[in-house]
Amino acid sequence: MSIEVANESGIDVSEAELVSVARFVIAKMDVNPCAELSMLLLDTAAMADLHMRWMDLPGPTDVMSFPMDELEPGGRPDAPEPGPSMLGDIVLCPEFAAEQAAAAGHSLGHELALLTIHGVLHLLGYDHAEPDEEKEMFALQDRLLEEWVADQVEAYQHDRQDEKDRRLLDKSRYFDL
């Protein structure tokens, strides 16, 4: 799976974390593992321009998604022809997201993970224009975020245990004389 990230926002964010959450969601949603995704991070001025051009709405927004093909919820970009399929582009605005994160009382990283999940779901055909769609999409988004965080915690704990085991084994070598 290829995920390209271009950060033109001027804000330092963890691109590895964005890729991690996108990969997690794509895998959980059973998308073809050869799928490709592009992520672009913009400043508020550039995002406002994009928002006006594509949505005819003034001001910046947090996330926009541009799917390559229209998909229905549950649809998969795993066409029978060989080769990777392009899901589309996700555009994030970290500066705008930072304001939302502060208002919600969580970190920018948490907000960007949430917005990445939101963007991927849009690429897969989910929407929130109608109340029922919103309920379904936001519940799925929250569940995926919770599962990704749990996965990250488990990986961290596993890495810490591996490090402890390595140090213990290194110390035990002194007794093998």
Curated annotation (Swiss-Prot):
GO biological processes: rRNA processing
GO molecular function ontology, one term from the record: zinc ion binding
GO cellular component: cytoplasm
UniProt cofactor note: Binds 1 zinc ion.
Major subcellular location class: cytoplasm
Cofactor: Zn(2+)
Alphabetized SUPFAM superfamilies for the sequence: Metalloproteases ('zincins'), catalytic domain
Keywords, ordered alphabetically: Cytoplasm, Endonuclease, Hydrolase, Metal-binding, Nuclease, Ribosome biogenesis, rRNA processing, Zinc
Secretion signal, residue range per the UniProt entry: none
Record-listed E.C. numbers: 3.1.-.-
Annotated positions binding Zn(2+): 118, 122, 128
Subcellular compartments: Cytoplasm
Pfam families with a match to the protein in the record: YbeY (PF02130)
Enzyme class: hydrolase
InterPro entries xrefs: MetalPrtase_cat_dom_sf_prd, YbeY, YbeY_CS
Protein family (similarity comment): Belongs to the endoribonuclease YbeY family.
NCBIfam families registered for this protein in UniProt: rRNA maturation RNase YbeY
Chain's role: Single strand-specific metallo-endoribonuclease involved in late-stage 70S ribosome quality control and in maturation of the 3' terminus of the 16S rRNA.
Protein name, as recorded: Endoribonuclease YbeY
